């Protein structure tokens, strides 16, 4: 038996951050390119760009900035903070659910 969950953050009923956006930002951090990140994730550039821009607009924060090399992208310090806090949130929820799972296993 397992308890399943998904976490995302909404503002005014619209997604601003979740596992998908987290994955996109981490791929950008590794690749320094939205195009390369999208390819790595099996997404179109347009889909990755759309999610990134939607999050930036809804948060009213820049998540990426242009690098020194042409067309390179880097995460902003705010993006890194958001990723860090999201990972902590995931870990906290995981710990709570792990305890709940143990309790439910006793009942079933």
PLM features per residue range, with description:
Residues 1-13:
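Short, Lys/Arg-enriched N-terminal segment that forms or immediately precedes the first helix
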Residues 51:
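Residues within the DNA-recognition helix of helix-turn-helix
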Residues 57-62:
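Residue cluster at the C-terminal edge of the helix-turn-helix DNA-binding motif
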Residues 82-104:
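Alpha-helical linker/hinge and terminal dimerization helices associated
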Residues 29-38:
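Short helix-boundary/capping micro-motifs
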Residues 24-25:
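Short alpha-helical "packing" element that flanks the helix-turn-helix/winged-helix DNA-binding module
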Residues 46:
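Key DNA-contact positions within bacterial/archaeal DNA-binding proteins
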Residues 66-89:
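Basic, amphipathic "hinge/linker" alpha-helix immediately C-terminal to the N-terminal HTH DNA-binding motif
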């Amino acid at each position: 038996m397992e308890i399943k969950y998904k976490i995302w953050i909404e503002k005014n009923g619209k997604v601003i951050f979740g596992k998908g956006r987290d994955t996109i930002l981490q791929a950008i951090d590794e690749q320094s390119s939205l195009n390369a990140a999208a390819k790595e994730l099996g997404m179109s550039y347009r889909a990755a760009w759309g999610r990134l821009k939607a999050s930036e607009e809804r948060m009213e924060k820049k998540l990426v900035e242009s690098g020194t090399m042409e067309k390179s992208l880097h995460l902003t310090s705010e993006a890194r903070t958001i990723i860090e806090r999201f990972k902590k949130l995931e870990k906290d929820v995981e710990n709570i659910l792990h305890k709940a799972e143990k309790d439910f296993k006793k009942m079933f």
